């Protein structure tokens, strides 16, 4: 029961920064609604992490593992997902304008195609252009 209670605790920005500095995994953690703007998550383990409603503007996720993560309604404007694993991630209603998805794995990811055309997202994955800014 104690382990279940731990999962209900939402981490703060400081706690996330401390875990990253220690090189610890953020897999299965809850950081919804947190202000994580401009944080460098390069290579981080964020599998099944709940990042719903989080402010991740200009954050860096290069080569990070976000498989199964929930980014539902998150602010991802200007974020860099170069080489990130977003397989099975939920990006519904996420704000992706200006994000870079170059070579990101978006297999079976739920994409915010009601907000941004799928072609714009795919162009970013294939060419490295920013989402919403055609090359």
Show where each model-derived region lies:
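Tandem repeat scaffolds
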Residues: 3-135
């Amino acid at each position: 029961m104690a382990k279940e209670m731990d999962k209900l605790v939402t981490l703060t920005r400081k706690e996330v920064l401390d875990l990253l500095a220690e090189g610890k995994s953020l897999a299965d953690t809850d950081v919804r609604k947190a202000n994580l703007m401009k944080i460098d998550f390069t290579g981080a383990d964020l599998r099944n992490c709940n990042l719903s409603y989080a402010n991740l503007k200009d954050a860096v996720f290069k080569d990070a593992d976000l498989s199964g993560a929930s980014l539902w309604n998150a602010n991802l404007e200007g974020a860099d997902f170069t080489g990130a694993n977003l397989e099975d991630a939920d990006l519904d209603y996420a704000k992706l304008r200006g994000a870079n998805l170059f070579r990101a794995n978006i297999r079976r990811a739920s994409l915010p195609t009601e907000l941004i055309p799928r072609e714009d997202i795919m162009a970013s994955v294939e060419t490295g252009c920013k989402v919403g800014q055609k090359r």
